[in-house]
Regions:
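Conserved recognition-core residues within compact binding domains
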Residues: 2-103, 108-150
Length: 150
């Protein structure tokens, strides 16, 4: 089920429509938006000893992992899972018809998890992104697709 909302960005100067979808594998627990945000849903947790706990939903805080991607920890059935935000976004919004294993950040910014910045790619396509590393910053020279004729 899609839920629409309005999300203010950059000091309220621009409004975007934010679309929410359930996180694949965590339906009823978490949702992810087309803008790359993740929220937990209100739910009731029942422990094995019979205790019942009401958990209020809200926006999830993310951290930057050692590869520079936004990540977070999701819980389901008393088990915790480490997930990257870009994978949650693309799995919810873009079908992987060609079964490509990698996700490419088109503009090269690993923390930009908006749906329009993500695409499914092969390992080879992912390696074709020319990147210049300068100090601790990186810049994409070009993103291109190889077309084979013959």
């Amino acid at each position: 089920m899609l839920k629409l909302g309005v999300h203010k960005t950059f000091k309220g100067k621009r409004l975007y429509t934010e679309v929410w979808k359930d996180v694949v594998g965590f339906e009823g627990y978490y949702q992810v938006s087309n803008l790359g945000r993740v929220r937990g849903l209100d739910r009731i947790i029942e422990y094995e000893d019979g205790r019942i706990y009401y958990m209020k939903g809200g926006m999830m805080k993310t951290t930057i992992n050692n590869k520079g991607y936004e990540s977070l920890r999701l819980s389901k059935n008393h088990t915790r899972y480490n997930k990257t935000v870009h994978r949650l976004v693309i799995e919810a919004f873009i079908p992987n018809f060609d079964n490509k294993p990698c996700i490419d950040h088109i503009n090269g910014i690993r923390t930009d998890n908006r749906i329009q910045n993500l695409r499914w790619v092969t390992y080879k396509e992912n390696m074709n992104n020319e990147v210049i590393y300068y100090s601790q910053h990186y810049f994409i020279l070009s993103v291109y697709t190889i077309v084979l004729s013959g």
